[in-house]
From Swiss-Prot:
InterPro entries: G-protein_gamma-like_dom (IPR015898), GGL_sf (IPR036284), Ste18_fungal (IPR041848)
Keyword Lipoprotein attached: yes
GO terms under biological process: G protein-coupled receptor signaling pathway; pheromone-dependent signal transduction involved in conjugation with cellular fusion
Listed PANTHER family: GUANINE NUCLEOTIDE-BINDING PROTEIN SUBUNIT GAMMA
Propeptide residue range(s): 91-93
Covalent lipid sites (S-palmitoyl cysteine): C89
Molecular function in Gene Ontology: G-protein beta-subunit binding
Localization, UniProt: Membrane
Protein keywords: Lipoprotein, Membrane, Methylation, Palmitate, Prenylation, Transducer
Region entry Disordered, spans: 1-22
Residues where Cysteine methyl ester is found: C90
Protein name: Guanine nucleotide-binding protein subunit gamma
Lipid-attached positions, S-farnesyl cysteine: C90
Length: 93
């Protein structure tokens, strides 16, 4: 019959500390999850139809210079993407 040796499991107070630290870790994780869920719950919500209407209104009222096929050609004086011309005669590099 084989001989079984007893295992040294260590100091019982150390085992208790490890279990306590694991419990503290679980509690902290649950608390953080609870806080995130509370923040989600407090976030303002609007119906999808209202959000879609708001986006459509914005797109119809805001001129997009990158889509000239919809808004027509952009006058040079209004083009924000046109390189700015310097008023001086010299450029220092």
């Amino acid at each position: 019959m084989p001989q079984y040796a007893s295992r040294d499991v260590g100091d019982p107070s150390q085992i208790k500390k490890n279990k306590q630290s694991m419990a503290d870790l679980k509690l902290r994780r649950l608390t953080e999850l609870n806080n995130r869920l509370r923040e989600d719950l407090e976030r303002e919500r609007i119906p999808v139809s209202q959000a879609a209407k708001s986006i459509i209104t914005y797109c119809n009222s805001t001129r997009d210079y990158m889509v000239p096929s919809v808004w027509g050609p952009v006058p040079k004086s209004e083009d924000p993407y046109l390189p700015q011309q310097s008023s001086g005669c010299c450029v220092v590099m």
